[in-house]
């Protein structure tokens, strides 16, 4: 009986080693709550009603060039935001970042400063974990299509996020804001970053023409917009709730202050709104709900690289680094504002 029990423990130990080894080889954390995999109807082969292969190829592109030379730099600039989102979400969910999950994608850039695992509830953890892993795919897709740039030095410390919120409110919050202390704090911090990616992709779309580049941007924009919508939706569910320990300051006020800060730093008018607005700014000027930030025709706002850098640097000046990029963002576009060579 004892030998049988020992044998069972030995087999269990071997299975554990194998599963852990497989996870390490892939580099990705494993979700232990996923059900046992079985054949899925989602991936079943689809045939035409005539019994042959269904025609699934898109029509031929009007522009016969996959990636045009002038497509490269705007798409590489986007990697600055993708790196930032990836590191923030991965560390928040798993306590590790690209250097542990996909080290080849960092292209030799320095690790982020101050990022750490957040104290998240189950639902928020699942959302953030998925977003983080999605960002890994985004970085890989951009690098595969237009080439990469090294990950810049990214400041994701509680101190930096505290400065962001102090800048948004115009005074020092007491205690300083820390995104890693709770699910709500992490969601509010997440409100700061992904929306800018949407603005950037909308602004980039008119200036690229290669069919592969256009396809890449559309795919990125779709998922980035969905991520922002989920984050805003989760915050909207709590819009009237006070954010502890800040007395009567509500979730809605936090989003309004952050959006106003981004407009102020961007210096190009209103391109950002919180989760509630005056009815005159709502969809068709008929509603004060603002789960999705959009213009008068309910279209996404566009921002230029210069606008984005003014906001991300927290300086209002694309020539003066700081904020999330203390040494400046990377790529030829960002470095040109600093009078430096391409990196």
Give names to the regions the model predicted.
Residues 5-23, 45-48:
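Cleavable N-terminal signal peptides of Sec/SRP-targeted secreted and luminal proteins
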């Amino acid at each position: 009986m004892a030998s049988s029990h020992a044998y069972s423990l030995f087999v269990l130990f071997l299975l554990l080693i194998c599963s852990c080894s497989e996870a390490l080889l892939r580099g990705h954390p494993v979700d232990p709550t996923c059900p046992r995999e079985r054949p899925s109807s989602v991936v079943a082969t689809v045939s035409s009603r005539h019994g042959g292969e269904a025609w699934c190829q898109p029509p031929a592109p009007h522009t016969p060039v996959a990636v045009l030379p002038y497509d490269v730099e705007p798409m590489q600039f986007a990697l600055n935001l993708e790196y930032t989102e990836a590191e923030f979400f991965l560390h928040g969910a798993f306590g590790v970042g690209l250097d542990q999950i996909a080290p080849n994608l960092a292209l030799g850039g320095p690790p982020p400063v101050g990022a750490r695992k957040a104290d998240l509830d189950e639902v928020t953890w699942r959302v953030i974990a998925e977003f983080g892993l999605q960002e890994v795919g985004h970085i890989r897709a951009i690098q595969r299509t237009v080439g990469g740039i090294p990950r810049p030095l990214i400041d994701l410390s509680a101190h930096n996020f505290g400065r962001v919120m102090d800048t948004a409110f115009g005074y020092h919050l007491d205690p300083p804001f820390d995104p890693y202390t709770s699910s709500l704090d992490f969601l509010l911090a997440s409100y700061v970053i992904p929306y800018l990616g949407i603005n950037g992709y909308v602004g980039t779309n008119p200036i690229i023409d290669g069919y592969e580049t256009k396809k890449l941007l559309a795919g990125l924009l779709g998922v980035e917009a969905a991520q922002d919508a989920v984050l805003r939706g989760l915050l909207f569910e709590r819009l009237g709730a006070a954010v502890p320990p800040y007395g009567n300051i509500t979730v809605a006020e936090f989003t309004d202050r952050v959006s106003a800060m981004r407009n102020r730093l961007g210096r190009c008018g209103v391109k950002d709104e919180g989760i509630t607005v005056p009815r005159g700014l709502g969809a068709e000027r008929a509603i004060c709900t603002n789960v999705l930030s959009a213009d008068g025709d309910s279209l996404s706002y566009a921002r230029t690289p210069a606008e984005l850098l003014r906001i991300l640097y927290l300086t209002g000046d694309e020539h003066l680094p700081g904020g999330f990029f203390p040494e400046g963002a990377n790529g030829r576009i960002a470095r040109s504002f600093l009078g430096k060579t391409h990196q």
